[in-house]
Curated annotation (Swiss-Prot):
This is GTP cyclohydrolase III. GO terms for biological process: biosynthetic process. Keywords: GTP-binding, Hydrolase, Nucleotide-binding. Belongs to the archaeal-type GTP cyclohydrolase family.
Length: 231
């Protein structure tokens, strides 16, 4: 699988130049440029895992090296600092991002090598009855629960070579290799708290769309805890 790691250079120095009354401005600018990055990524059928804001990952399967080069250039034009990127390859998203991260920290120029494309398995997780619990708990306690679930899901996916992004509300987006799909099904087939829509596609955007389609079918069915759609 292919993962593009992207690092914003001199990001801390840029934030410090904004003065002491800067946190609101940093959040405003971060959200503004991430909105633009999501827009650019969608045009190339990928999806950014924004993670730390100053470092993020993109699923790159199904995208040519030429397209990646154009995408990186488009992102650079919309960011307040220079960026550095490197493409990593591995049997799983976790391994691919490790290799991309090592490459990112050990080479001077943006590097895009040719790697084999693999199908992508996207996972759209949703917590059952979480919206209802807001009637009986505080906003902050609900956030703590959401965070704890995120940690537990992250640990599970890490064990099987996957990566995870919190989407907001009670939704999470994961990526795994297609070989690990059965492990996810086994883990959540009897779970009455979490449902997972699984999508398998040739690129990240397609896989995510299919995962969301699967999740909607689970919600409509109300009997299953998982469903899978494949391109």
């Amino acid at each position: 699988m292919k993962i593009l790691a992207i690092k914003l250079l001199d990001y801390r120095e840029w934030t410090e130049r904004l003065g002491y009354d800067r946190e609101w401005l940093i959040q405003k600018i971060q959200n503004k440029f991430m909105m633009k990055i999501h827009e650019i990524a969608s045009q190339y059928n990928t999806f950014p895992l924004q993670l730390r804001f100053d470092n993020f990952l993109m699923i790159a399967d199904g995208i040519t090296t030429t397209q990646l080069a154009y995408m990186i250039n488009d992102m650079q034009e919309n960011l307040p600092v220079r960026i550095k990127s490197c493409l990593g390859y591995g049997k799983t998203p976790l391994e691919a991002q490790w290799n991309a991260s090592i490459c990112l920290n050990n080479q001077d120029d943006n590097e895009i090598k040719e790697y084999t494309d693999e199908k992508i398995a996207a996972l759209h997780f949703d917590i059952n009855f979480n919206t209802e619990t807001l009637k009986y708990t505080s906003v902050y306690d609900s956030f703590i629960e959401i965070t704890n679930i995120y940690v537990n899901l992250s640990r599970f996916l890490y064990k099987i070579g996957g990566i995870l992004q919190y989407l907001g509300g009670d939704n999470y987006l994961g990526f795994i290799s297609t070989e690990s799909v059965n492990k996810v099904i086994e883990e959540f087939s009897d779970d009455n708290k979490i449902k997972v829509g699984i999508g398998i596609g040739k690129n990240a955007r397609t896989a995510i769309r299919l995962a969301t389609t699967s999740l909607e079918k689970i919600r409509n069915n109300r009997e299953k805890t998982w469903h899978m759609e494949e391109e």
